[in-house]
Curated annotation (Swiss-Prot):
SMART domains: EFh (SM00054)
Matches recorded under SUPFAM superfamilies: EF-hand
InterPro entries xref list: CALM/Myosin/TropC-like, EF-hand-dom_pair, EF_Hand_1_Ca_BS, EF_hand_dom
Name of the protein described by the UniProt record: Calmodulin-related protein
The organism of origin for this protein: Petunia hybrida (Petunia)
Residue stretches spanning the membrane: none
Length: 184
C-alpha cells in the first residue's frame, strides 16, 4: 500500500512523524497519531482514529512505527480518492442536480444498471437511507449508506480471511463454529 506514495509524500510524512517521535526511537504513541494526522491536513474523528489505531497497532503495545504509519496514510489517501468517487456517484444518481436523490431518480439509475426494482423495493431503499425522513436522499445520507456498505464488505472479507486462515491452521479439517468463536 505504501508503495503507491510518491517520494515527496513519504518525505512529508517522515517529517511530520519525526516531530512527534520524542525520543527518536522510530515510534509514536497512538495518542499522538491524531496530532500527526491533523498536522498533515487530515481531520479524523475520534472513532476514525480509534479504527485506524486498531488497524495499525496490531500488537497493542501503544506505539506506531513509521512503516505502519506510511501504510495508514496510504490507506487514508485512498479513502480520500474514494470520497471523490462518492461525489461523482451521487451526481450520477442526482439527475436534476438539486442535491437530492428522489425515488424516481433512484429507479431510473437502477433500471439503467439492469436492476429492475419494484416501487416497493425503491421506496424501501429510500426509507433505509433517508435519515431525516423527507422522502429523498441527500449527500450525507448517501455517504452514510455507501460507507456502511463498504464497512460491511470489509468485515465480510476479514471474516473470510480469518476463516480461511483457521482452516489452514487446522490442517484442512473443519473447525466447529463454537471452536472458531473461541479462537477469535
Amino acid at each position: 500500500m505504501a508503495d503507491q506514495l510518491t517520494d515527496d509524500q513519504i518525505s512529508e510524512f517522515k517529517e511530520a512523524f519525526s516531530l512527534f517521535d520524542k525520543d527518536g526511537d522510530g515510534c509514536i504513541t497512538t495518542k499522538e497519531l491524531g496530532t500527526v494526522m491533523r498536522s498533515l491536513g487530515q481531520n479524523p474523528t475520534e472513532a476514525e482514529l480509534q479504527d485506524m489505531i486498531n488497524e495499525v497497532d496490531a500488537d497493542g503495545n501503544g506505539t506506531i512505527d513509521f512503516p505502519e504509519f506510511l501504510n495508514l496514510m496510504a490507506r487514508k489517501m485512498k479513502d480520500t480518492d474514494s470520497e471523490e468517487e462518492l461525489k461523482e456517484a451521487f451526481r450520477v444518481f442526482d439527475k436534476d442536480q438539486n442535491g437530492f436523490i428522489s425515488a424516481a431518480e433512484l429507479r431510473h439509475v437502477m433500471t439503467n444498471l439492469g436492476e429492475k426494482l419494484t416501487d416497493e423495493e425503491v421506496d424501501e431503499m429510500i426509507r433505509e437511507a433517508d435519515v431525516d425522513g423527507d422522502g429523498q436522499i441527500n449527500y450525507e445520507e448517501f455517504v452514510k449508506v455507501m460507507m456502511a456498505n463498504r464497512r460491511r464488505r470489509r468485515i465480510e472479507e476479514s471474516k473470510r480471511s480469518v476463516n480461511s486462515n483457521i482452516s489452514r491452521s487446522n490442517n484442512g479439517r473443519k473447525v466447529r463454529k463454537r471452536d472458531r468463536c473461541t479462537i477469535l
